[in-house]
Amino acid sequence: MKKIFIFLSQSLALGVCVCGTIVNVANASKVLDVSFVTYANEAKIEFLGVKADTILSNGVVSEEVAYEMAQGVANVAKSEVGVGVTGVAGPGGGTAKKPVGMVCFGFYVNGKTVTYTCRFGEIGRNQVRKSSVEFVMAKLLELLDD
């Protein structure tokens, strides 16, 4: 079995959630090496290499930004796997185009980046976070299995 490391970049109040889910298992350091929590746009730009134009053109909650976050964290960590997550957990902050419960995901796996958007709805901040963690874990397993 090939050993892989997972690298995460998150801006949706998930920093503790995704990492917490992984580190709750013994020997988590065998798969998790680094995680960035980049709430500020400047942090996404400085640490992950997200382009300011991408944020300006698409908004921070977008598949385009999640894409660049996933690629950025993988690049910084020199990894084959990177995950980027950005969204609106609520209770406020949503708009008609980007409502509360909308979360965008980027997955960089072995040189290929794919993105997804989930609209969990106004199910409460903690449930949006929980649903996002579940999505990340399930999708990672699926993509790594391919």
Language-model segments: residues:
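Short alpha-helical segments enriched in small residues
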Residues: 1-146
